[in-house]
Amino acid sequence: STNGGWQIPDQSNPGTNLGQSPLRSPSVFNFYRPGFVPASTTLTPSVVVPEFQILNESSTGGYLNFNMSTISAGIGPGNPRDMTASYTAELALVTDATALVRRVCLLLSAGQVSAANQAAIVAALENTPVTAASSTSTKLNRVYAAVLMAMACAQYLIQK
C-alpha cells in the first residue's frame, strides 16, 4: 500500500468485481453444500468444489474483468491506485514467453497449471511478438496477459 491504508473497496458486484466480499454471505443459509460438483466440468468426478456454487456466466466475466483491471492498474483508491504489483522480474523474461509463463504459473499456482494450459498460454502470447526493442507498454501488456490467463485456469482457481 502506497499510503499505508490497505483499502480494498467492496467487491460484491458479480458483473465487475469478485461477486463476494468479507462478512457478506453468498447465500441466505451462510454455507455451501459440501458435495457440490459443477455440471459439465473437466474436473475428475470425485472432485467437489462447494465454493463454485456462486459461479455463473456473470460472475466469471466479472472475475476476469476485475482481474484484468487489477493486474494492470492495481486496486484501491487514488490515481495511481493504492496497491499495485511490481512486474520487474517478469519484465526480465518478457521476450521468452515460455519462461515467463513458467514463472507466472509457479508463483500463482505453485506449478499446478498443466503443461497443456501453459502451452496454450505461451501460444496465445506468441501471437503478439515482443522483442527487447519493444515499447515498455507492449512488454507490460504481455506480462499482464500471462498473469490474466494463468489466473483464469482452473488449476489456479482450485489450489491444492
Which stretches of residues belong to each language-model region?
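Flexible, low-complexity segments enriched for small/polar residues
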Residues: S1-K160
